[in-house]
Structures are given as C-alpha cells and as structure tokens.
C-alpha cells in the first residue's frame, strides 16, 4: 500500500514475544516502574535489549490502540488511522525487521501552523500514523523508566498528574512564604532543543544503542512545509507522541539543578515558576538560572518575558494567584475570562444559523469543560455576572429566531404578556440587544424557563464541583 516499509503493529499474531518475566534473567537488568491502569508495579528491564521490549506484540498492540483512540490527521503519506491496520497486517514482518536491523527510516513530518492568542503561530509537526505508532511504542516503554527520575514538582505530560496538581503545588509553596516568583519563559523551547545535548542525556539511561539511534532518526527526520523540505537540525516538533516525553527528559536537568539549590518551583512542560522569599533573591536566581539554561542546556531564555514579580496577578496555566489572610487563593486570570466570553459570544451569535438543540449542546459542552478546568478558582461573583450576560445573549437569539412581527406578538402572548404590550413590543424597532435586556423579554423568557429548556449555566456547573 505504501512503497516504503515502515513499522508494524501488533495485532500481529506471528511475532516472537518475550514474556515480561523472561527479562529477570538478563545480565545487567535493572528495575523500573511499569504504570498500569490500576497500579504501579516494578518490572525488570534489560538496558541492553530495550528495543525488543519496544517492538513486543503486547506493547505494539497497546500503541496501536492509543493511536486509534487519539485519531488525528494523516501525515505526508495521507494514510488515515482506518488504513493503518490493513497496512500493518500486510507489512508487520518487514516493519519489525527494519526496526531490528536499523534500516527503518521515519517519514518527513507535516508542518501545521496553529494560531496563538498573541497573534503568532504555534508550529506543530504531524508524523504519519505508522511513525506515530512506533513513537507511541517507544513512549510507553521509556515513560516508566524515566518516571522514577522525574521531579515530583514536574506535572506536565506525566501519568496521573496535571495542571490542577501544579496549581495546588504552587499554592503550598506560596503558603510557606515564598511570595516572589521568577516567571521563566523559554524562547521557542520545542523548536530549539539541542539534539546532541538531548542524545547525551538519553544515553545516560538508555544503553541500547539501537533505541538511541531510532530516537535520533525521529529528531532528524525533516519537515515538509507547504511542499518544501526543511532539515531538522534542532528541536522536538510538537505533535508526535514522543515529543512530550523528550521535553520532560531535557527539562528534568533543570529540575535537578533547582532541587540541588533548594529552590522551590513548579513546572508544567516548559512553563516554569521558581519561588523566593524576597525580590532581591528572586533577581539573583533569575540571573543564575538563565546562565545554567543557556550555558549547560543550550536553550534560549526569553529575557523580555522572564520576569521577577510578586505572586499577586501572575498568570499560570490560565489562573492567577492572590494572598488573603496569609493563604494563597486562586482566581481566573483576566485573559482567560476574556477568552471565555469571546467564545460564549461566538456560540450565541445571531448569525450562525444554529437551531435550539445544537446551541444548547454546544453551550453545555463548552461550559462544562471551562468550569471543569477552572473550578479551583474563587469565581462565584464573576460567574453570576457572566450568567446574566449569557442569558441576555440567549434571549437575543430567541427573539431573532421569531423573525416576523406576527410570530413575536403570538409568542409574547403565549409567554404571559398582555396583548397590548405584546403588540407594542412585537412592532418595536429597537435593536436585538436592547430588546433582549428589556423587562418585557425578561418577563416573557424568565431564568427558570431558560433552565427548564435545558440551557446550561456557569454557576450550575460550578455548583456541581462545589455542592456546599
């Protein structure tokens, strides 16, 4: 189906498989943490024969399921996730052979540009589905090995950790009196990772040269950008399953340095905050850490965006902090509030042509997701005020959907408005937004009626997280 023999899966029934217990007898075997769905168990791994574990049928099958579950766009070969299984069934043996003998070559990565909030573009790299399969298999094998090395203050792209854990960790540090922060900004981190430095760090743990070579091939596979080839001299393009793990392995060197200095910090991917008790100490830390990052890790610190400040108002993962009565509290950052209102405005646009059912569904999905992420924040007053604004937007949509004067009059009467007022307002030339805020429409379409009709509210979702 494709000319080049890429990798294989493991829904494959004829491939030799080492049982996990076999590795106990390997010379020089070490133990690492195998992360299962329900618990974490210790499993020996042979640092000289790691590739065999990566391409084992059970690991490849798990990787195949993960790639299918995540779906995603096709790469430059245009193979979809649905086409992956037939290809693997036909080419599995050739793929495994090429991985074992080192002849395997990853395809070019397809460049995709995603707009950022600041108007710039985020560069993503979309590997082919077969490349994603092999990367996922590598990721599944290396993750439990490196989990034991990672700092407990690192939260991004790790099992059973997330943004909320990072925020709670920051709260605890601030509660201990570390009220000044170095808000560290790495300039284009994913695009500027030094390949040689990363390979050096990987080689300290991974002693199977075939695995190191395979990872190096992915790093240097090249990019297809608008039909033009671009060499990959540095960076770990975002978009592949392996990139998050490699970024954590690289930045774990920074974590170890900060820990050795006794500096409290939190890190989510490349978004780090280092805490100090005084502004003077924070300035010293900023300078020394910048020298370490640029001198030892060969990364670039954005000196304009890396700032020292009091914790109040600092933006981190969509939240900001403030201290009240000696305790750190969380609130939603103003930029996150503005972005949320802009999205709600889009979902309640008068001109998107959606029916009632689709609008309700879209609103509920977005509101539940947004509140679910920001539920740690103290934001009742903001949510109540935003709900008032949202209900007015909904009344505006409903009023517009009635269209004709005759329909408006009839519906106002059905909603309990007397005939005279229904006639007057039905013939009104006021704009949609003004009528939506009028006492007549608020009487006709009450908050209770909107709730009974199934429209979600921000406070309703917030109360689900905070029932008391």
Describe the predicted segments one by one.
Residues 123-124, 128, 329-330:
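Conserved phosphate-binding loops in nucleotide/dinucleotide-binding enzymes
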Residues 328, 347-408:
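Right-hand nucleic-acid polymerase module
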Residues 98-113, 117, 149-313:
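Conserved polymerase palm-domain catalytic core
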Residues 1-89:
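Non-catalytic, polymerase-adjacent accessory regions of viral genome-replication enzymes
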Residues 73, 83-108:
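Amphipathic alpha-helical blocks
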Residues 393, 398, 402-468:
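Extended C-terminal regions of large enzymes
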Residues 220, 296-368:
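A conserved non-catalytic segment of reverse transcriptases
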Residues 138:
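Nucleotide/phosphate-binding loop and acidic/charged catalytic motifs
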């Amino acid at each position: 189906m494709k000319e080049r023999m890429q990798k294989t899966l493991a829904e494959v029934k004829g491939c030799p498989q080492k049982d996990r217990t076999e590795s106990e007898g390997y010379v020089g075997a070490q133990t690492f943490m195998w992360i299962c769905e329900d618990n974490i168990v210790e499993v020996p791994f042979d640092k000289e024969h790691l590739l065999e574990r990566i391409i084992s049928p059970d690991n490849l099958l798990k990787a195949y399921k993960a790639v299918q579950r995540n779906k995603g766009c096709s790469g430059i070969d245009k193979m979809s996730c649905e086409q992956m299984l037939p290809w693997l069934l036909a080419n599995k043996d050739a793929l495994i052979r090429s991985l074992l003998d080192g002849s395997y070559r990853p395809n070019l990565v397809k460049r995709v540009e995603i707009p950022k909030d600041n108007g710039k573009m985020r560069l993503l790299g979309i590997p082919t589905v077969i490349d994603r399969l092999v990367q996922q298999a590598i990721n599944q094998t290396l993750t439990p090995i490196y989990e034991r090395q990672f700092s407990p203050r690192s939260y991004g792209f790790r099992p059973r950790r997330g943004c909320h854990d990072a925020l709670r960790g920051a709260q605890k540090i601030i509660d201990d009196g570390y009220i000044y922060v170095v808000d560290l900004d790495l300039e284009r981190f994913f695009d500027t990772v030094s390949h040689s430095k990363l390979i050096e760090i990987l080689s300290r743990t991974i002693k199977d040269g075939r695995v190191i070579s395979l990872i190096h091939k992915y790093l240097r596979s090249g990019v297809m950008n608008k039909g033009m080839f671009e060499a990959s001299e540095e960076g770990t393009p975002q978009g592949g399953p392996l990139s998050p793990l490699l970024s954590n392995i690289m930045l774990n060197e920074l974590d170890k340095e900060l820990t050795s200095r006794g500096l409290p910090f939190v890190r989510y991917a490349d978004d780090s905050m280092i805490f100090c008790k005084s502004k003077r100490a924070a300035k010293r830390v900023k300078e020394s850490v910048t020298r370490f990052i640029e001198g030892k890790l060969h990364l670039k610190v954005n000196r304009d965006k890396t700032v020292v400040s009091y914790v109040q108002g600092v933006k981190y993962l969509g939240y900001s902090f403030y201290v009240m009565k000696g305790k750190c509290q969380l609130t939603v950052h103003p930029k996150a509030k503005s972005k949320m209102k802009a999205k709600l405005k889009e979902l309640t646009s008068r001109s998107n042509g959606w029916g009632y059912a689709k609008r309700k569904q879209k609103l509920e999905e977005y509101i539940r997701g947004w509140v679910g992420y920001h539920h740690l924040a103290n934001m009742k007053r903001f949510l109540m005020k935003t709900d008032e604004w949202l209900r007015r937007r909904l009344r505006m949509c409903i009023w517009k959907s009635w269209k004709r004067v005759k329909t408006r009059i009839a519906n106002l009467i059905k909603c309990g408005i007397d005939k005279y007022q229904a006639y007057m307002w039905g013939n009104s030339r006021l704009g949609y937004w003004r009528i939506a805020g009028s006492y007549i429409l608020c009487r006709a379409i009450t908050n209770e009626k909107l709730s009974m009709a199934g429209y979600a509210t921000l406070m309703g979702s917030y109360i689900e997280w905070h029932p008391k």
